[in-house]
Amino acid sequence: LFKWLPSSSSDALSALAGEYDPEFSGFFAHQVVNNACATLAVLNALGNIPSLPTGPQLAELISFTTGMDAQTRGMVITSADWLREAHNSLSPPSAISLDGLGLPRKSEDAYHFVVYLPVMGALYELDGLKRHAVRHGSFDEQGEGWVKKARCVSCLELALANKLTSRAQ
Protein backbone atom coordinates (compact mmCIF):
# COMPACT_ATOMS: atom_id res chain seq x y z
CA LEU A 1 0.00 0.00 0.00
CA PHE A 2 1.61 3.24 -1.18
CA LYS A 3 0.58 6.85 -1.13
CA TRP A 4 -0.47 7.51 -4.71
CA LEU A 5 1.56 10.02 -6.70
CA PRO A 6 0.61 11.50 -10.08
CA SER A 7 1.72 9.27 -12.96
CA SER A 8 4.75 11.32 -14.02
CA SER A 9 6.21 11.02 -10.51
CA SER A 10 5.23 7.36 -10.34
CA ASP A 11 6.93 6.66 -13.69
CA ALA A 12 10.10 8.38 -12.46
CA LEU A 13 10.17 6.11 -9.41
CA SER A 14 9.89 2.97 -11.52
CA ALA A 15 12.61 4.11 -13.87
CA LEU A 16 14.97 4.56 -10.93
CA ALA A 17 14.04 1.39 -9.09
CA GLY A 18 13.54 -1.07 -11.97
CA GLU A 19 12.87 -1.45 -15.68
CA TYR A 20 9.60 -1.64 -17.54
CA ASP A 21 9.19 -5.08 -19.10
CA PRO A 22 6.90 -4.76 -22.13
CA GLU A 23 7.54 -8.45 -22.91
CA PHE A 24 6.34 -9.68 -19.49
CA SER A 25 4.57 -12.96 -20.21
CA GLY A 26 2.90 -13.35 -16.82
CA PHE A 27 -0.54 -12.13 -15.81
CA PHE A 28 -0.71 -8.32 -15.73
CA ALA A 29 -3.82 -6.16 -16.07
CA HIS A 30 -4.30 -2.40 -16.09
CA GLN A 31 -6.67 -0.72 -13.68
CA VAL A 32 -9.27 0.83 -15.98
CA VAL A 33 -11.84 1.90 -13.36
CA ASN A 34 -11.50 3.96 -10.18
CA ASN A 35 -11.29 2.42 -6.73
CA ALA A 36 -10.33 -1.06 -7.90
CA CYS A 37 -6.60 -1.13 -7.14
CA ALA A 38 -6.85 -3.60 -4.23
CA THR A 39 -8.92 -6.07 -6.24
CA LEU A 40 -6.64 -5.69 -9.24
CA ALA A 41 -3.52 -6.14 -7.10
CA VAL A 42 -4.93 -9.41 -5.77
CA LEU A 43 -5.77 -10.58 -9.31
CA ASN A 44 -2.31 -9.62 -10.60
CA ALA A 45 -0.82 -11.70 -7.79
CA LEU A 46 -3.13 -14.71 -8.13
CA GLY A 47 -2.64 -14.82 -11.88
CA ASN A 48 1.10 -15.35 -11.36
CA ILE A 49 0.95 -18.19 -8.84
CA PRO A 50 0.24 -21.24 -11.00
CA SER A 51 0.50 -23.66 -8.06
CA LEU A 52 -2.37 -21.90 -6.28
CA PRO A 53 -5.71 -23.66 -6.75
CA THR A 54 -8.39 -21.26 -7.97
CA GLY A 55 -12.12 -21.54 -8.30
CA PRO A 56 -13.67 -22.16 -11.70
CA GLN A 57 -14.59 -18.51 -12.36
CA LEU A 58 -11.10 -17.19 -11.68
CA ALA A 59 -9.47 -20.04 -13.60
CA GLU A 60 -11.73 -19.26 -16.58
CA LEU A 61 -10.92 -15.53 -16.38
CA ILE A 62 -7.17 -16.17 -16.29
CA SER A 63 -7.41 -18.66 -19.15
CA PHE A 64 -9.67 -16.43 -21.27
CA THR A 65 -7.35 -13.42 -20.93
CA THR A 66 -4.14 -15.31 -21.71
CA GLY A 67 -2.28 -13.48 -24.49
CA MET A 68 -4.24 -10.24 -24.10
CA ASP A 69 -2.49 -6.93 -23.57
CA ALA A 70 -2.80 -5.36 -20.12
CA GLN A 71 -5.41 -2.77 -21.17
CA THR A 72 -7.71 -5.34 -22.79
CA ARG A 73 -7.26 -7.71 -19.85
CA GLY A 74 -8.27 -4.84 -17.52
CA MET A 75 -11.41 -4.22 -19.58
CA VAL A 76 -12.35 -7.91 -19.45
CA ILE A 77 -11.90 -7.89 -15.68
CA THR A 78 -14.25 -4.90 -15.30
CA SER A 79 -16.93 -6.71 -17.28
CA ALA A 80 -16.90 -9.79 -15.01
CA ASP A 81 -20.13 -9.43 -13.03
CA TRP A 82 -19.12 -11.99 -10.39
CA LEU A 83 -15.90 -10.08 -9.71
CA ARG A 84 -17.63 -6.69 -9.54
CA GLU A 85 -20.16 -8.10 -7.05
CA ALA A 86 -17.36 -9.52 -4.88
CA HIS A 87 -15.44 -6.22 -5.05
CA ASN A 88 -18.51 -4.13 -4.19
CA SER A 89 -19.43 -6.40 -1.29
CA LEU A 90 -16.11 -5.46 0.34
CA SER A 91 -16.26 -1.73 -0.49
CA PRO A 92 -17.46 0.85 1.99
CA PRO A 93 -20.99 2.07 1.10
CA SER A 94 -19.71 5.58 0.36
CA ALA A 95 -17.40 4.27 -2.39
CA ILE A 96 -20.34 2.67 -4.18
CA SER A 97 -23.09 5.24 -3.65
CA LEU A 98 -21.09 8.44 -4.31
CA ASP A 99 -18.94 7.21 -7.17
CA GLY A 100 -19.84 8.98 -10.39
CA LEU A 101 -22.39 11.37 -8.86
CA GLY A 102 -20.08 14.38 -9.03
CA LEU A 103 -20.62 15.16 -5.36
CA PRO A 104 -17.82 17.00 -3.56
CA ARG A 105 -15.68 14.74 -1.43
CA LYS A 106 -13.54 15.48 1.55
CA SER A 107 -9.93 15.95 0.47
CA GLU A 108 -7.89 12.94 1.53
CA ASP A 109 -4.58 11.39 0.64
CA ALA A 110 -5.03 8.70 -1.96
CA TYR A 111 -3.43 5.31 -1.44
CA HIS A 112 -2.73 2.61 -3.98
CA PHE A 113 -2.09 -1.15 -3.82
CA VAL A 114 0.91 -2.62 -5.65
CA VAL A 115 2.08 -6.25 -5.80
CA TYR A 116 5.69 -7.42 -5.60
CA LEU A 117 6.31 -11.09 -6.31
CA PRO A 118 8.77 -13.48 -7.88
CA VAL A 119 7.93 -14.36 -11.47
CA MET A 120 10.23 -16.31 -13.80
CA GLY A 121 13.27 -15.89 -11.52
CA ALA A 122 12.99 -12.13 -11.04
CA LEU A 123 11.21 -9.75 -8.69
CA TYR A 124 8.37 -7.97 -10.46
CA GLU A 125 6.25 -5.01 -9.45
CA LEU A 126 2.71 -5.29 -10.76
CA ASP A 127 1.00 -1.92 -10.58
CA GLY A 128 -2.20 -1.63 -12.61
CA LEU A 129 -1.62 2.10 -13.12
CA LYS A 130 1.75 1.59 -14.82
CA ARG A 131 2.00 0.83 -18.52
CA HIS A 132 4.01 -2.38 -18.01
CA ALA A 133 5.13 -4.74 -15.28
CA VAL A 134 8.36 -3.48 -13.69
CA ARG A 135 11.29 -5.91 -13.45
CA HIS A 136 13.51 -5.34 -10.42
CA GLY A 137 16.04 -8.03 -11.27
CA SER A 138 17.02 -11.36 -9.84
CA PHE A 139 17.21 -12.12 -6.14
CA ASP A 140 19.19 -14.35 -3.81
CA GLU A 141 17.41 -17.69 -3.42
CA GLN A 142 18.89 -18.11 0.09
CA GLY A 143 17.43 -16.69 3.29
CA GLU A 144 14.63 -14.22 2.78
CA GLY A 145 15.07 -14.36 -0.99
CA TRP A 146 12.60 -12.30 -3.00
CA VAL A 147 10.96 -10.89 0.15
CA LYS A 148 14.20 -9.15 1.15
CA LYS A 149 14.57 -7.73 -2.37
CA ALA A 150 10.93 -6.54 -2.37
CA ARG A 151 11.48 -4.84 0.99
CA CYS A 152 14.58 -3.05 -0.35
CA VAL A 153 12.78 -1.93 -3.51
CA SER A 154 9.70 -0.71 -1.64
CA CYS A 155 11.88 1.19 0.87
CA LEU A 156 13.71 2.86 -2.02
CA GLU A 157 10.43 3.80 -3.68
CA LEU A 158 9.03 5.18 -0.41
CA ALA A 159 12.17 7.26 0.15
CA LEU A 160 11.99 8.63 -3.39
CA ALA A 161 8.26 9.32 -3.04
CA ASN A 162 8.86 11.22 0.21
CA LYS A 163 11.56 13.27 -1.49
CA LEU A 164 9.25 14.10 -4.42
CA THR A 165 6.40 14.97 -2.05
CA SER A 166 8.57 17.27 0.07
CA ARG A 167 9.85 19.09 -3.04
CA ALA A 168 6.28 19.69 -4.22
CA GLN A 169 5.32 21.39 -0.94
Language model segments and positions:
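Cysteine-dependent deubiquitinase/ubiquitin-like isopeptidase catalytic cores across multiple families
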Residues: 1-169
